[in-house]
A protein has these predicted regions:
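Terminal, low-structured helical/coil segments at or just beyond the last alpha-helical repeat
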Residues: 23-38, 168-229
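Canonical tetratricopeptide repeat
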Residues: 111, 145, 179-180
Length: 229
């Protein structure tokens, strides 16, 4: 699933210098290079810069992952997947560094979870999402991504809870999670690790929720708007 990337604005640091003398003369020189004090970026500013670099890395990794999904040639698919994994690993380092610089930056914790999940580290991903949601309760993207991690661990009841939370507050992300649930069902069909009875029950629940979502689409602002286009 392609993530919705969000860059954070970085304040511009400018040092104001007045002209020397009444006639706008040159600055005094000590004869030994530029002696002007340089503004040191705060840890929060460094965290934003590092976070934005991580977002760019995630965008590239997502593109490689999508390319791998489209490939029919096994060698090309493997190459694209390897490129995606390298990109996610690089992004994870950046987001982890951002959390070290600013531990209260919930966006960075959310992306730590996202990249960990993309690398298959679902338990670590859940821990990162919990940190994000502790800092920003109700943060919809973290709730959605956590739902994906629950699916990766076959924790279906918790994945359902994540969907229902999103359904009441963010139908767009709820729909994305429902799509992921359908993909999970298709991938798990015939897998020995999943009880067929449990799988069928979950599939029925997903179908039911999909029907409800379609029937109530017009009650949302986006759904109502689409009817008049």
């Amino acid at each position: 699933m392609k993530t919705s990337t969000k860059f954070l604005a970085i304040p511009l640091l400018l040092a104001a210098w007045s002209a020397f003398g009444a006639g706008g003369g040159s600055m005094p020189s000590g004869g030994g290079g530029d002696l002007r004090p340089k503004e040191q970026a705060t840890p929060e500013e460094q965290a934003r810069t590092t976070y934005n670099a991580g977002v760019r890395a995630v965008e590239k990794a997502d593109a490689s992952s999508a390319d791998a999904a489209r490939q029919t040639d096994a060698r090309k698919q493997r190459k694209a997947n390897d490129k995606a994994r390298g990109g996610y690993a690089s992004a994870l380092k950046k987001f982890t560094r951002a959390t070290e610089l600013n531990p209260r930056m919930h966006e960075s914790w959310n992306y730590v979870g996202y990249t960990q999940r993309k690398l298959g580290n679902y338990v670590a991903a859940l821990a990162a999402y919990e940190r994000a949601l502790t800092l920003a309760p109700g943060y919809a993207e973290a709730i959605e991504y956590r739902g994906h991690a629950y699916l990766g661990l076959d924790r279906l009841s918790e994945a359902k809870e994540a969907y229902l939370m999103l359904y009441s507050g963010n139908r767009v992300l709820a729909d994305k999670l429902l799509v992921a649930m359908r993909e999970w069902i298709g991938a798990r069909r015939g897998a020995p690790a999943v009880d067929p009875v449990v799988l069928d029950a979950f599939a029925s629940w997903v179908d039911e929720r999909g029907t409800i979502a379609r029937q109530t689409a017009g009650l949302t602002r986006a759904g109502a708007g689409s009817r008049w286009r």
